[in-house]
Amino acid sequence: VVSALVNRRGHLMVEKIAARLPAQDELNLNPEERHGDAGDAEVVVIGMGRAGFAAYQRLTDHYRLRVAGVDSDGPRIQRLAAEGLRVIEGDATDLYFWNQLRRSDSVRIAVLAMPRHGANVTALECLRESGFSGKVAAVARYDDEVQWAREHGVGIAFNVYAGAGLELADQV
């Protein structure tokens, strides 16, 4: 019983303990532990794989929005940074990441573009717990995932396979 209570809010205990520890020089920290900086981004795209990359490109090129990507894959981040994209290294399923992320009030949209539904669910929970109150969009592979996302406050939930089918038909 006690462990169930502790596990449910364990991150709060960790935060309280961490607040009492001395500050660390960021250069000495593991890159995943450093503060991310979204700068003046209006949109944060979480997961910079194929779907996230496409969303990032469309949001910047077509809609002229300021976007920051988030990913945990170091080589992918380096490749995207070399292409001129702003990508933050971090684990979006970790509440610590969201609490450490430097973001201005300009961030008003979060796009959950990770391939696993469970990761998007956890990232959504962390995003909400960190105080984010903007719009959330999410990709999903299955209709039940789209339904779950909508039931949990995701304003735009999109089935990637349905979208691919529509685009394919438009190209024929």
What are these regions (language model features)?
Residues 1-172:
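Cytosolic regulatory regions of ion transport systems
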